[in-house]
């Protein structure tokens, strides 16, 4: 990232610089910087980033891709995440990064942490999510958007109607923004489902997070609903599909 007080760096691939001259990260304002270079395929490589001055250096990420058909999955997992945090990010830089990556699909999953926030209301939450989805659409108009709702949790005395209100707010926000919506909560079985899943070894002892087997089960449910939504699979009679297409 270029920024005030930014330093200079060199980038090396297998010990050799990929630059004709050092890269300056100095800029009057924060802005994303991108560097692209090729490497021989089907081999291991070592990438080094060396600072050449005492200036600030911030690396937002490294992407290694093959020029071949397939799926590239970029993941950004943040502990204690809330949708509102997106609004605190540098919006021009976020837009630049999304424009450079050109995603075909952007997936957001929120709700587990917000459900315990004091003063939470369905109306304000729906408005927040709809605004975030619109911003992402403006930054990456070619991308489809998918909002995933939270799984059930049974560690706190959260009324089932409050969780249901959150799912309704998320579904309405997705519909308003032309995004798809999938409910983990409903896929699990709704209220008190976490107790059942934990008893089956699918939920962790905190009754908030799933085990590896639980997340695999939920992923299978999502895949079933996704293929059903596109007419490529027969419905699972044991479950009701929970994916809303835009």
Where are these regions (language model features)?
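Conserved SGNH/GDSL esterase-like catalytic core that processes O-acyl groups on lipids
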Residues: 1-131, 209
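Short C-terminal domain-edge/linker segments immediately following a structured domain
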Residues: 27-32, 79-80, 103-109, 137-141, ...
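Generic detector of short alpha-helix boundary/capping microenvironments
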Residues: 37, 50, 137, 162, ...
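Extracellular/periplasmic catalytic domains that process cell-envelope and extracellular macromolecules
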Residues: 40-42, 99-100, 139-140, 174-176, ...
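Residue-level recognition of the N-termini of beta-strands and the immediately preceding loop/turn
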Residues: 71, 143-145
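Catalytic His-Asp segment of secreted/periplasmic serine-dependent ester chemistry enzymes
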Residues: 91, 151-246
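A generic secondary-structure signal
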Residues: 96-97, 135, 225
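Conserved N-terminal glycine/acidic-rich loop preference
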Residues: 102-115, 123-139, 146-184
